[in-house]
């Protein structure tokens, strides 16, 4: 693959420039060499029945219109069979520990998706309920000829897909597309990988084939045969059963256009410092794109295509960003796809489980309840500041996420409590919670996955250790603590209180 030439960013026409790139690639998905290995046919049939009334794409992980392989594949089927194209999204009554913060970000972006679909003569349906019920109803009611679904390796959405596989009409193909990873998860590797070093080569050898420009999703030439219900966006969240005390954050604008604004900001302002300053929580050097990645509002592949055009100016920064955004991110999907215990201590390697068990009864110098952790009530002002950042902004600097999770292991009664509480707090407050990257981050910090055994010590065993003094050597801790009001709560602990009878 030839290296892109040096480029100067032109922010005024970024959206138009991307549209032109797609048009220059192909006139539509029908004229594009779509890689069939991106798709898994989950049903016994793979042909669209002649009496079908449309093609349906159930959007879940990939919440965008353009640069979406799932949507493009659905349009390919619809164009080939001369059928209307429909897309639906299901507003769940509850999803793990998602809060109003996440649901508002989602719904505002879906309104943008709906408007974009309208411009392209594609029918958008906002459904309420669990997908294995309401998507199936839509397929049956309107005689959809095929159902296209996103790949998402987490347990709950995978269960919905399995239910649909078992209940969808026998003559309706069910196709799953990995539009999230550059190299589809099942293509990158057919097994659970030990770490980045074992999957890196497998992905990099396949990148030249998969890291291509996208064709456009075009205005659809076939009209829907039935009227689409009007969407009441103001009341879209009226009946969801979520925590409404955790409200939206202001720094990230929902949707594809909001994502492009953040990408533009990263390329023009922060990319040059990514290599040297990305591990310093007091510096503004990260992409900040993880909320949009998680909700699928921008394609990681699109971001890589744009960022790598600046490799001549910022070689090390671009290379490191690609390592984090491709290798590390796709390693997380690999872990969750091939390890059913991706959010449990049981999912750790044997050496880590043995080591944690050997130190299970070690005395903890400090111990906290989940509520105390959630409310930043520890003796550690840096930890409290990091927790405050996550609660207020819906994000935490990557370096501090490691320190934050490891201290939870140090200050809780058991590894099981530590992992459960870290996942709960991350899922509740982080804009990118409930994501393979989040689970893997907690599992790396607490259970040593994708890592090796280190010098043995109390509580941690052979799990990699991090401490306050190490952070002081890395960055200006006092500055970060001041910014996020990290107050010390002097609380010398007596572990015995955790086991007193009530």
Task: Give the positions of each predicted feature.
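Trp/Phe/Arg-rich N-terminal binding region typifying the photolyase-homology
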Residues: 2-214, 218, 317, 388, ...
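Glycine/tryptophan-enriched, flexible segments
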Residues: 10-19, 51, 184-186, 190-351, ...
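Phosphate-binding glycine-rich loops and adjacent basic patches that engage nucleotide phosphates
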Residues: 31-38, 65-80, 96-102, 121-128, ...
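Residues in well-ordered beta-strands of folded domains
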Residues: 58, 175, 200, 264, ...
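Alpha-helical packing segments of well-folded alpha/beta enzyme cores
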Residues: 70, 109, 113, 259-266, ...
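Active-site-proximal binding-pocket segments
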Residues: 280-481
